[in-house]
Amino acid sequence: DLVMVSIIGSHDGTTAVDYTVNCAIGYPNATGYPDDPRPVNNVVPAWDLMCGQMAALGLLAADRYRSQTGHGDLVTLALTDVALAAAGMLGGIAEAQINQTERPSIGNDLYGAYGTDFVTGDGRRVMVVAISPKQWRGLQEATGTTPQVQELASTLRVDFSDEGERFLARDKLTQLFLP
């Protein structure tokens, strides 16, 4: 009645670790800046973190199976499958298949809404993100750009209350918010 979780690198039994899986999935090519072709790796071992959570869930499911049937179970989880599942859940696989194109690198911009980094007066960098309506209003008020943002929205014929529209116009908006 043993309940066990076995974490392997790849589904075929070959070795893989978080950083090699990250490269194989292609995320280092998706990060970075559009004008710089170098891949940028992520320092957060995301696949390891997700794999741990999935392993814990698998262990709970196997334990429940044992309590209901009296039989043990072996849950095998491949790190590469975790990464592929995550890429699928985030829409990256379907987007590439449907649009027949790769999502371009967007640097430090936040995908799908407005967010980017700015250099401060003392040469440091700060990340600014405005997703909610309150955050969006606050950013405009803090930078004193409400009239300019309204004028830009009118010129582009968009509604910046929609965060997707803010994402599409992020370069023009960033120019307004620059100190």
Regions found by a protein language model. Give the residues of each.
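Aromatic-enriched alpha-helical interface/lid elements that frame and gate functional surfaces
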Residues: 114-179
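Active-site-adjacent "lid/gating" segments in soluble enzymes
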Residues: 1-130, 138
